Curated annotation (Swiss-Prot):
Residues reported in the UniProt entry to bind L-glutamine: G50, E51, S52, R109, I136, R137
This protein's encoding gene: pdxT
UniProt pathway: Cofactor biosynthesis; pyridoxal 5'-phosphate biosynthesis
Origin species: Streptococcus pneumoniae serotype 2 (strain D39 / NCTC 7466)
Complexes and interactors: In the presence of PdxS, forms a dodecamer of heterodimers. Only shows activity in the heterodimer.
Highest taxon in the source lineage: Bacteria
Gene Ontology biological-process entries: glutamine catabolic process; pyridoxal phosphate biosynthetic process; pyridoxine metabolic process
Protein name: Pyridoxal 5'-phosphate synthase subunit PdxT
Length: 193
């Protein structure tokens, strides 16, 4: 099994460490050539946290947006954390256009405010259990379509969800020692292969 990690910007190295802990091979995807070279071998894709506007621009500049979108729509399992969640959203409240736009949800960027407004908590995540959650200027999911399953709620806000082959979290599971949400994603990838 090999998981691709979008490595244009953001917390990609931390995701690679978690996958290594789980004994799963990962490959950093920095450009279209990387993606096309590894695409047939990929069991899944992680879109890490970072700055969603910058990541969206880089995806467009590298001509990666459409090939990744097509792969996701064709069933490639994808896990978007924080900015990665924003990339997957069909609608972003403060923007005119979405990025990948594959997941039926409306999101609000930087809902948890500035860096100083960031926080840590623990909450129940369906299918995983009670897990630690680190929020760093994270988005919230304002609403979801009928096909989207809500996995976690914190302070009456949706912070994790799944739609078919797409898993998202507003928080950063890669910044804790708890690997269960990544294991949940690995299990999704195994079911698809």
């Amino acid at each position: 099994m090999k998981i691709g990690i979008l490595a244009l910007q953001g917390a990609f190295a931390e995701h690679a460490k978690v996958l290594d802990q789980l004994g799963v091979e990962s490959v950093e995807l920095r450009n279209l050539d990387d993606f096309q070279q590894d695409q047939s071998d990929l069991s899944g894709l992680i879109l890490p946290g970072g700055e969603s506007t910058t990541m969206g621009k880089l995806l467009r500049d590298q001509n990666m947006l459409l090939p990744i979108r097509e792969a996701i729509l064709s069933g490639l399992p994808v896990f978007g954390t924080c900015a990665g969640l924003i990339l997957l959203a069909k609608e972003i409240t403060s923007q005119k256009e979405s990025h990948l736009g594959t997941m039926d949800m409306v999101v609000e960027r930087n809902a948890y405010g500035r860096q100083l407004g960031s926080f840590y908590t623990e909450a129940e995540c369906k299918g995983v259990g009670k897990i630690p959650m680190t929020f760093i200027r994270g988005p919230i999911i304002s609403s979801v379509g009928e096909g989207v399953e809500i996995l976690a709620i914190v302070n009456n806000q949706i912070v994790a969800a799944q739609e078919k082959n797409m898993l998202v979290s507003s928080f950063h599971p890669e910044l804790t020692d708890d690997v269960r949400l990544h294991q949940y994603f690995i299990n999704m990838c195994k079911e698809k292969s």
